[in-house]
UniProtKB/Swiss-Prot annotation:
Name used for this protein in its record: NAD(P)H-quinone oxidoreductase subunit 4L, chloroplastic
A Pfam family per the record: Oxidored_q2
Alphabetic keyword roster: Chloroplast, Membrane, NAD, NADP, Plastid, Plastoquinone, Quinone, Thylakoid, Translocase, Transmembrane, Transmembrane helix, Transport
Localization (cell): Plastid, Chloroplast thylakoid membrane
Length: 101
């Protein structure tokens, strides 16, 4: 019974993240939605690891790996956004064309 609630929460977070990523015009909001998607995936890894094989920690270890990748993305993403803002004076995705100068 608990499995359905956790998977529902994960699907809800994933859906919000996908919707925000598709409709977002701001790069910071897109990065936040990407974090929501990664957190939903982590919830699935931990839930299925606990539900199917609680003695082996493969899902938990992989979720720690995904958390470290998300931390690197959270550190590098705003730095890239700030450098784009410094050069282009905008962080709107539809106004950026990095191939033209």
């Amino acid at each position: 019974m608990m499995l359905e609630y956790v998977l529902g929460l994960s699907a809800y977070l994933f859906s919000i993240g996908i919707y925000g990523l598709i409709t977002s015009r701001n790069m910071v909001r897109a990065l936040m939605c990407l974090e929501l998607i990664l957190n939903a995936v982590n919830i699935n890894f931990v839930t299925f690891s606990d539900f199917f094989d609680s003695r082996q920690l493969k899902g938990n270890i992989f979720s720690i790996f995904v958390i470290s990748i998300a931390a690197a993305e959270a550190a590098i993403g705003p730095a890239i956004v700030s450098s784009i803002y410094r050069n282009r004076k905008s962080i709107r995705i539809n106004q950026l064309n990095l191939l033209n100068k």
